[in-house]
Protein backbone atom coordinates (compact mmCIF):
# COMPACT_ATOMS: atom_id res chain seq x y z
CA UNK A 1 0.00 0.00 0.00
CA UNK A 2 1.38 3.41 -0.99
CA UNK A 3 0.78 6.39 1.30
CA UNK A 4 1.77 10.06 1.41
CA UNK A 5 3.16 11.14 4.77
CA UNK A 6 1.60 14.25 6.30
CA UNK A 7 4.27 14.54 9.00
CA UNK A 8 7.63 13.07 9.88
CA UNK A 9 7.34 9.41 10.91
CA UNK A 10 10.39 7.78 12.55
CA UNK A 11 12.03 5.04 10.46
CA UNK A 12 9.70 5.76 7.53
CA UNK A 13 10.08 9.25 6.07
CA UNK A 14 9.24 12.92 6.36
CA UNK A 15 6.49 15.28 5.22
CA UNK A 16 5.47 14.71 1.61
CA UNK A 17 7.28 11.42 1.08
CA UNK A 18 5.43 8.75 -0.87
CA UNK A 19 6.27 5.45 0.80
CA UNK A 20 5.13 1.87 0.52
CA UNK A 21 3.92 0.31 3.77
CA UNK A 22 2.15 -2.88 4.76
CA UNK A 23 -1.63 -2.51 4.34
CA UNK A 24 -2.43 -3.07 8.02
CA UNK A 25 0.09 -0.45 9.17
CA UNK A 26 -1.36 2.07 6.75
CA UNK A 27 -5.05 1.35 7.44
CA UNK A 28 -4.85 0.77 11.19
CA UNK A 29 -2.19 3.27 12.31
CA UNK A 30 -0.96 5.87 9.84
CA UNK A 31 -4.26 6.92 8.25
CA UNK A 32 -6.44 6.96 11.44
CA UNK A 33 -3.78 8.94 13.35
CA UNK A 34 -3.62 11.54 10.56
CA UNK A 35 0.01 10.80 9.80
CA UNK A 36 -0.65 9.76 6.18
CA UNK A 37 -3.22 9.55 3.39
CA UNK A 38 -3.60 6.89 0.72
CA UNK A 39 -1.57 7.74 -2.39
CA UNK A 40 -4.27 8.17 -5.03
CA UNK A 41 -4.12 10.69 -7.87
CA UNK A 42 -6.76 12.89 -6.20
CA UNK A 43 -4.97 12.79 -2.84
CA UNK A 44 -1.64 13.63 -4.50
CA UNK A 45 -3.17 16.75 -6.08
CA UNK A 46 -4.86 17.73 -2.81
CA UNK A 47 -1.61 17.24 -0.90
CA UNK A 48 0.33 19.47 -3.30
CA UNK A 49 -2.20 22.25 -2.67
CA UNK A 50 -1.87 21.85 1.13
CA UNK A 51 1.92 21.32 1.19
CA UNK A 52 2.77 24.90 2.25
CA UNK A 53 0.19 24.81 5.05
CA UNK A 54 1.49 21.47 6.35
CA UNK A 55 5.13 22.60 6.17
CA UNK A 56 4.27 25.77 8.10
CA UNK A 57 2.47 23.71 10.76
CA UNK A 58 5.46 21.35 11.04
CA UNK A 59 7.91 24.25 11.43
CA UNK A 60 5.70 25.85 14.12
CA UNK A 61 5.60 22.56 16.06
CA UNK A 62 9.39 22.30 15.81
CA UNK A 63 9.87 25.89 17.05
CA UNK A 64 7.49 25.28 19.98
CA UNK A 65 9.35 22.08 20.90
CA UNK A 66 12.71 23.90 20.78
CA UNK A 67 11.36 26.65 23.04
CA UNK A 68 10.12 24.01 25.51
CA UNK A 69 13.53 22.29 25.36
CA UNK A 70 15.30 25.54 26.27
CA UNK A 71 12.90 26.07 29.18
CA UNK A 72 13.42 22.49 30.41
CA UNK A 73 17.21 22.87 30.22
CA UNK A 74 17.03 25.78 32.70
CA UNK A 75 14.97 23.79 35.23
CA UNK A 76 16.23 21.95 38.28
CA UNK A 77 13.40 19.74 39.47
CA UNK A 78 13.27 17.98 42.84
CA UNK A 79 10.99 15.13 43.82
CA UNK A 80 10.71 13.99 47.44
CA UNK A 81 9.92 10.34 48.18
CA UNK A 82 9.97 8.27 51.32
CA UNK A 83 13.17 6.29 51.51
CA UNK A 84 14.85 3.79 53.74
CA UNK A 85 18.46 3.60 54.75
CA UNK A 86 21.08 3.96 52.03
CA UNK A 87 18.67 6.04 49.89
CA UNK A 88 16.55 3.15 48.60
CA UNK A 89 13.07 4.50 47.84
CA UNK A 90 9.85 2.95 49.04
CA UNK A 91 8.23 2.67 45.63
CA UNK A 92 9.76 4.45 42.66
CA UNK A 93 9.75 7.63 40.59
CA UNK A 94 8.27 7.00 37.14
CA UNK A 95 7.45 8.94 34.01
CA UNK A 96 4.13 10.19 35.41
CA UNK A 97 5.80 11.62 38.54
CA UNK A 98 8.49 13.36 36.48
CA UNK A 99 5.98 14.80 33.99
CA UNK A 100 3.82 16.15 36.83
CA UNK A 101 6.83 17.73 38.56
CA UNK A 102 8.05 19.44 35.37
CA UNK A 103 4.54 20.66 34.55
CA UNK A 104 4.22 22.04 38.10
CA UNK A 105 7.53 23.86 37.55
CA UNK A 106 5.99 25.70 34.62
CA UNK A 107 6.84 23.73 31.47
CA UNK A 108 4.05 21.49 30.16
CA UNK A 109 5.34 17.95 29.55
CA UNK A 110 3.36 14.83 28.75
CA UNK A 111 4.12 11.49 30.34
CA UNK A 112 5.01 9.83 27.01
CA UNK A 113 7.72 12.45 26.38
CA UNK A 114 9.77 11.32 29.40
CA UNK A 115 12.38 8.68 28.58
CA UNK A 116 13.61 6.33 31.32
CA UNK A 117 15.68 3.69 29.47
CA UNK A 118 16.58 1.82 32.68
CA UNK A 119 13.06 1.83 34.10
CA UNK A 120 11.71 3.75 37.09
CA UNK A 121 14.12 5.46 39.50
CA UNK A 122 14.46 3.49 42.74
CA UNK A 123 17.36 5.29 44.48
CA UNK A 124 17.68 8.83 45.82
CA UNK A 125 20.21 10.99 43.99
CA UNK A 126 20.81 13.27 41.01
CA UNK A 127 19.74 12.17 37.54
CA UNK A 128 19.81 13.52 33.99
CA UNK A 129 16.52 12.62 32.33
CA UNK A 130 15.96 12.79 28.57
CA UNK A 131 12.73 14.31 27.32
CA UNK A 132 11.72 13.52 23.73
CA UNK A 133 9.67 16.63 22.90
CA UNK A 134 9.59 16.26 19.10
CA UNK A 135 11.01 13.83 16.57
CA UNK A 136 13.96 16.24 16.11
CA UNK A 137 14.16 17.73 19.63
CA UNK A 138 15.44 16.09 22.80
CA UNK A 139 16.01 17.95 26.07
CA UNK A 140 17.94 17.02 29.19
CA UNK A 141 16.37 17.63 32.58
CA UNK A 142 18.31 17.77 35.85
CA UNK A 143 16.28 15.81 38.40
CA UNK A 144 17.05 15.43 42.08
CA UNK A 145 15.28 12.64 43.94
CA UNK A 146 15.31 13.37 47.67
CA UNK A 147 14.80 10.57 50.16
CA UNK A 148 12.79 11.56 53.24
UniProtKB/Swiss-Prot annotation:
InterPro entries: Ribosomal_bL9, Ribosomal_bL9/RNase_H1_N, Ribosomal_bL9_bac/chp, Ribosomal_bL9_C, Ribosomal_bL9_C_sf, Ribosomal_bL9_N, Ribosomal_bL9_N_sf
Organism per entry: Methylococcus capsulatus (strain ATCC 33009 / NCIMB 11132 / Bath)
Any single Gene Ontology cellular-component annotation: ribosome
The protein's role, per its UniProt record: Binds to the 23S rRNA.
The keyword Zinc-finger is annotated on this UniProt entry: no
Molecular-function GO term, any one: structural constituent of ribosome
NCBIfam families named among the record's database cross-references: L9
Similarity remark: Belongs to the bacterial ribosomal protein bL9 family.
Keyword presence, Signal: no
One of the GO biological process terms: translation
Superkingdom of origin organism: Bacteria
Lineage, top ranks: Bacteria, Pseudomonadati, Pseudomonadota, Gammaproteobacteria, Methylococcales
Pfam short name (any one): Ribosomal_L9_C
Protein name: Large ribosomal subunit protein bL9
Keywords: Ribonucleoprotein, Ribosomal protein, RNA-binding, rRNA-binding
Amino acid sequence: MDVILLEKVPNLGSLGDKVSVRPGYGRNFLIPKGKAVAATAAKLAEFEQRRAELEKKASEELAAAQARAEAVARLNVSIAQKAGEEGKLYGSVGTKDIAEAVTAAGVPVERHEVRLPHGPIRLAGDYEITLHLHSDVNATLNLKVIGE
